[in-house]
Curated annotation (Swiss-Prot):
GO function term, MF aspect, one: ferrous iron binding
Keywords assigned by UniProt, alphabetized: Iron, Lyase, Manganese
Record carries keyword Disulfide bond: no
Encoding gene, per UniProt annotation: uxuA
Name of the protein this chain belongs to: Mannonate dehydratase
InterPro entries: Man_deHydtase, Xyl_isomerase-like_sf
Family membership: Belongs to the mannonate dehydratase family.
Keyword Hydrolase in annotation: no
Catalytic activity, EC: 4.2.1.8
Pathway assigned in UniProt: Carbohydrate metabolism; pentose and glucuronate interconversion
Biological function: Catalyzes the dehydration of D-mannonate.
BP GO terms, sorted: D-glucuronate catabolic process
Membrane-traversing stretches: none
Reaction catalyzed: D-mannonate = 2-dehydro-3-deoxy-D-gluconate + H2O
């Protein structure tokens, strides 16, 4: 696997020099300063590429070129945004970048209720608490028809949870859910957030699928001509939330997506933390079935809790994800590609990491502190080396 690291650009508290010392060789990056929908010019791409390469690193994956909300709802200027997206892909390809991670989640990218969940060892992790989320949706946001998303027991627990919240607790939970997290390009007030949700009224799962297929079919001629791989990131959490449809959550969704858009350039990001939050997702089987479409991997683990819809982010080799067999299957796919003449390694980044040690005293991007990811990368690197020496001849 190619060892990569997500970097948020010049304003990231983790520098390119730090990343080199972590042992990563590839950078996962995006031009966050360009507004959603606008074209990434070759000039801007080359400036960022030179900045990365000057440190002896490679811009391996774009994560991500954001998909404008009007593309997802297929309203307003959606065709203009698609045309701009196509031009951005052309420009990336001409600048030598061939892998783009993106998502098709409405409104929010990834969602957590707690950004500072304390682990037994004192480190801090990200957490999704189903009851806290229900309290937000039912009693803070007060989304119409939200009751239908929760059982009677969950509604009762959410009411107790809400009744025990202070104003500061409410503000913190609200901020955690609706403020733009790393990777989400937008932040919303409560009123703006509800207005964004309202834009999806009447958009069912089938309708969102239709819009995604239209979008990808527009892109594929450019991707096919330039060998540019689109790697969709799964929904996080991998289920409908806030009344919004989710369409990249299970192996059935991948089956559908690859059947509807059969181009080999239509691929996936295997995010083990996102897919792994569902107990019915067999990650190892997903890799076996769709390994030829995996162009990027995010390796992390989650631990589901007593309420199986609640989870926290575990250490990379702990939790519910069978990281041993996940890495084994990725290495088998790399071996298959190598035998077929494709020598490029699959880019892998240690996704998220616990805030620990000296980082506990620093301002960090939630999930993206340096030391926790350094630990995760080292653990996965060691696992990979052991598997290669034991089972692989090349």
């Amino acid at each position: 696997m190619e060892q990569t690291w997500r970097w948020y650009g010049p304003n990231d508290p983790v520098s390119l020099n730090d990343i080199r010392q972590a042992g990563a060789t590839g950078i996962v990056n995006a031009l966050h300063h360009i507004p959603n929908g606008e074209v990434w010019t070759k000039e801007e791409i080359l400036i960022r590429k030179a900045l990365i390469e000057d440190k002896g690193l490679t811009w391996s994956v774009v994560e991500s070129v954001p998909v404008h909300e009007e593309i997802k709802t297929q309203t307003g200027n959606y065709q203009l945004w698609i045309d701009n997206y196509k031009q951005t892909l052309r420009n990336l390809a001409e600048c030598g970048i061939d892998t783009v991670c993106y998502n098709f989640m409405p409104v929010l990218d990834w969602t957590r209720t707690d950004l500072e969940f304390e682990m037994d060892d004192g480190s801090k992790a990200l957490r999704f608490d189903q009851i806290a989320f229900a309290a937000f949706e039912l009693h803070i946001l007060k989304r119409p028809s939200a009751e239908g998303a929760y059982s009677d027991e969950e509604q009762a627990q959410a009411k107790i949870y809400f009744d025990n919240m202070s104003d500061a607790d409410i503000a913190k939970l609200t901020g955690n859910i609706i403020a733009g997290l790393p990777g989400a390009e937008e932040g919303y007030t409560l009123q703006e957030f509800q207005a964004q949700l309202d834009l999806y009224d009447g958009i069912t799962k089938d309708k969102l699928r239709e819009h995604m297929v239209y979008f990808l079919k527009e892109l594929m001629p450019i991707c096919d001509a330039n060998g540019l791989k689109m790697a969709v990131h799964p929904d996080d959490p991998p289920r409908p939330i806030l009344g919004l449809p989710r369409i990249v959550s299970t192996i059935e969704d991948i089956d559908w997506l690859t059947a509807e858009v059969p181009s080999q350039m239509n691929g996936i990001t295997m995010c083990t933390g996102s897919y792994g939050a569902r107990g019915d997702n067999d990650l190892v089987n997903m890799i076996r079935q769709h390994g030829d479409r995996i162009y990027f991997t995010h390796l992390r683990s989650t631990q589901r809790e007593d309420n199986q819809l609640s989870f926290h982010e575990a250490a990379h080799l702990d939790g519910d994800v069978d990281m041993y067999n996940v890495v084994m299957e990725i290495l088998k796919e790399e071996q298959r590609r190598d035998d077929a003449g494709d020598v490029r390694l699959i880019p892998m980044r240690p996704d998220h990491g616990h805030q620990m040690l000296d980082d506990l005293n620093k301002k960090t991007n939630p999930g993206y502190s340096a030391i926790g990811r350094l630990k995760g990368l080292a653990e996965v690197r060691g696992l990979e080396m052991a598997l290669k020496r034991a089972f692989f001849t090349k």
